[in-house]
Design a protein with these regions (language model features):
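A short, N-terminal "cap"/entry segment at the start of jelly-roll beta-barrel domains
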Residues: 1-27, 107
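Structural motif
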Residues: 29, 58-60, 67, 83, ...
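Conserved short histidine dyad/triad with adjacent acidic residue
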Residues: 31-45
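Short, conserved beta-strand element in jelly-roll/cupin
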Residues: 35, 46-61
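A cytosolic small-molecule/anion-sensing beta-strand core signal
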Residues: 55-56, 71-72, 90
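Short acidic-glycine-tyrosine-enriched beta hairpin
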Residues: 66-80
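Ligand-binding loop in jelly-roll beta-barrel domains
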Residues: 80-104
Length: 109
């Protein structure tokens, strides 16, 4: 699929407060993600490299024990197996890109 309208694409709940419209290629998972205000993404890690980009809202992001307030236009690169988590200070829209593909997310669709 070459063209996608994420405004109308079905979203799946990754876990409470985190809702994503996802696409998967052979090597990448792309997520257009909404987080409800106050949502806590607990500290976790995974084998995937991850890019997170803030489209709108405010997110307190923790990476390797360091906290940073991310605002629109800001983002983070999360290396493989790096402990990270977040708190949605406000409702947020973010872009998440993972490699390799998040097979576990495919199973949620």
């Amino acid at each position: 699929m070459a063209f996608i309208n994420y405004n109308t694409k079905n979203r799946v709940t990754i876990f409470p407060g985190v809702h994503s419209a996802m696409e998967h290629s052979s090597q990448i998972t792309y997520g257009h993600v909404h987080l409800d205000e106050g949502t806590v993404v607990p500290i976790h890690d995974h084998i995937h490299e991850q890019w997170t980009y803030i489209v709108e809202g405010k997110m307190e992001f923790t990476l390797n024990g360091e906290k940073q307030l991310l605002l629109p236009g800001m983002g983070a690169f999360i290396p493989s197996n790096a402990p990270h988590g977040a708190v949605a200070v406000t409702a947020c829209t973010i872009i998440d890109v993972f490699t390799p593909v998040r097979e576990d997310y495919k199973n949620k669709e």
